[in-house]
From Swiss-Prot:
It comes from the Eukaryota. CDD domains: F-box_AtFBL13-like. Keywords: Leucine-rich repeat, Repeat. It comes from Arabidopsis thaliana. This is F-box/FBD/LRR-repeat protein At1g13780. LRR repeats lie at residues 197-220, 243-266, 302-325, 355-379. Residues 372-424 form the FBD domain.
């Protein structure tokens, strides 16, 4: 029997106001304000929402007059001023707003759980006509907020409060924050005051010589890709992480001249896109002994990892390093996803030799932009004999000699291989699937039960 809905029947309005407020909390404040026109009951419901999510571009600024925005925030904070707030999110990447940090401080004092502030504002110097960031330092009560669970700051200033204690903070995302000029406030001091911190995403400030993270609670750490690189770095920068509970780490691009890892004994997964040198298109000098020692110590420090994702940049760096140093064994590693440049396929056996217990391999090949030199895959890594069960070769464009050579290398040498997957970016132009199957089935498979799968 089909159910019918009475015309004009509003199920949402029948919900309790407390539940409606929680629903509106997940919308931008601009959207929740619009609900005030629905009916008399909805007129002030948005003021009961336990949080703000504002973009200052939604307010009409005239002659740098920020009064409308400030009045809006003040009205919201004063309404039910004894109730707790759950979230305060604001993007004021437009003009500097006088005493805006006071409003942030008011929100913090209301027991917020989520603080998300982006303050990417600039001023133009009249003398040199260069744009400089306007730094809005966070209020001091931020550093002792007992309710804060998630903190995200972009282009904000952090000064030394003397003491940091954020007992509930689990998630922290800092994007190019500015530390005060005293030199006593830094990432290490901030993290040390977060006893239950689990996730840290950090895009650094170019002015710090050493950036250090020490945490026993930290489980996930990421340095994301940075779209704008500084062309005028004044100092050589070192990054150091000491986190015995860390399970996941992602390093996406070379923001630091030197990386030091310590006590990463719980590391499960790592995602690497680094070359161990700062500079677009640069590669490190294999004759640089301190750099070789740094790479050796880094690889040894992450060698307990179980799952690795590795970019073509890092593969190139490892190939360079392998000519002058020994890549350590990753005895716990069972899964690897590697983007492999076609020009470095000769390095593939030595690369896989470092993973003696590898079970799953996803190999993304890159189409050669020029005629490749002949290469031979001769040496058989240890994992081929006893552990390698699943191989996927991705990024295939057409079926050629190089692709056949890679596929036959795995089929003819892997003793326990269960599945070989060939993933094409489209349909091969010059071969049908049946042609490829026929060619591969002529090979002598070392593992007779290996299944070949073609994906187009």
């Amino acid at each position: 029997m089909e159910s019918t809905v009475m015309p004009g029947f509003d199920r949402i309005s029948e919900l309790p106001e407390s539940l409606i407020s929680q629903i509106l909390l997940h919308l931008p404040t601009k959207a929740s304000v619009k609900t005030s026109v629905l009916s008399t009951r909805w007129k002030n419901l948005w003021l009961n929402v336990p949080g703000l999510d504002l973009n200052c571009r939604d307010f009409p600024f005239q002659n740098n007059n920020e009064k409308l925005l400030i009045d809006f925030i003040d009205r919201f904070l004063q309404f039910n001023n004894e109730s707790r707030l759950q979230k305060f999110k604001v993007d004021y990447s437009r003009d500097k707003i006088i005493k805006f940090s006071d409003r942030i401080g008011d929100a913090i004092s209301r027991g917020i759980r989520v603080l998300d502030v982006e303050s990417n504002t600039y001023y133009r110097d009249a003398d040199d006509c260069i744009d400089y960031p306007c730094i809005e330092f966070m209020p001091l009560n931020l550093y002792s907020c007992k309710t804060l669970v998630s903190l995200k700051l972009s282009y904000s200033g952090l000064e030394d409060p003397g003491f940091v204690y954020l007992p509930c903070l689990k998630f922290m995302h800092l994007r190019e924050v500015r530390w005060d000029s005293s030199g006593t406030m830094n990432l290490e001091k901030l993290v040390s005051g977060c006893p239950v911190l689990e996730e840290l995403i950090y895009l650094h400030d170019d002015k710090l010589v050493v950036t250090r993270v020490r945490s026993r609670s930290l489980k996930r750490f990421s340095i994301p890709f940075r779209h704008k690189l500084s062309l005028f770095r004044r100092v050589t920068q070192t990054f150091e992480i000491d986190a015995p509970g860390l399970e996941y780490m992602s390093l996406k691009a070379d923001h630091f001249d030197r990386i030091v890892v310590k006590n990463l004994t719980s590391l499960f997964m790592i995602d690497l896109d680094i070359k161990f040198i700062v500079g677009f298109g640069w590669m490190f000098d294999p004759e640089d002994l301190p750099k070789r020692n740094e790479i050796r110590d880094f690889l040894t420090g992450i060698s307990s990892v179980r799952h690795m994702v590795i970019s073509h940049n890092t593969v190139k760096a490892l190939d360079l390093y392998s000519k002058v140093g020994l890549i350590p064994k990753f005895n716990n590693l069972s899964r690897v996803e590697a983007a492999f440049p076609s020009s470095l396929l000769q390095f593939l056996p030595a690369f896989l030799e470092s993973f003696p217990n590898l079970k799953h391999l996803i190999l993304e090949t890159e189409c050669p932009v020029e005629v490749m030199e002949k290469f031979e895959l001769v040496n058989v890594p240890r994992c081929f004999v006893s552990t390698l069960e699943h191989v996927e070769i991705k990024g295939l464009f057409d079926w050629g000699e190089q692709d056949m050579k890679i596929a036959s290398y795995f089929l003819e040498n892997s003793a326990v291989l269960k599945k070989l997957i060939l993933s094409f970016m489209g349909c091969p132009q010059h071969y049908s699937e049946s042609d490829i199957y026929e060619e591969l089935n002529k090979l002598t498979k070392r593992s007779p039960r290996c299944q070949i799968i073609i994906r187009c």
